A protein has these predicted regions:
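Minor-groove-contacting beta-hairpin "wing" of winged helix-turn-helix DNA-binding domains
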Residues: 48-52
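Short, solvent-exposed alpha-helical "recognition" segments
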Residues: 35-42
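Polyanion-binding surface elements
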Residues: 1-35, 54-65
């Protein structure tokens, strides 16, 4: 297999920070993640789940650019 570029994550956010940025229900976010429509969460430890802040911000920018209808 070829070597891939290392992932660069500069900052992660926890669930409560995500809720402040994206006012959607947890179940909606989970379903969107499963469909590939929202950045995927990952575990830093078994009890610490985070999202990449840059990915969430990019998702918000893309959503803002889409027409509502």
């Amino acid at each position: 297999m070829g070597r891939s570029e290392p992932l660069e994550i500069t900052k992660t956010i926890r669930r409560h920070q995500l809720r402040e940025m994206v006012p959607l229900a947890d179940s909606t976010i989970y379903e969107m993640e499963q469909r590939g429509e929202f950045p995927r969460r990952f575990a830093l430890s078994p009890r610490c789940i985070v999202w990449d802040l840059a990915e969430v911000q990019a998702w918000l920018i893309a959503r803002r650019a889409k027409p509502v209808f």
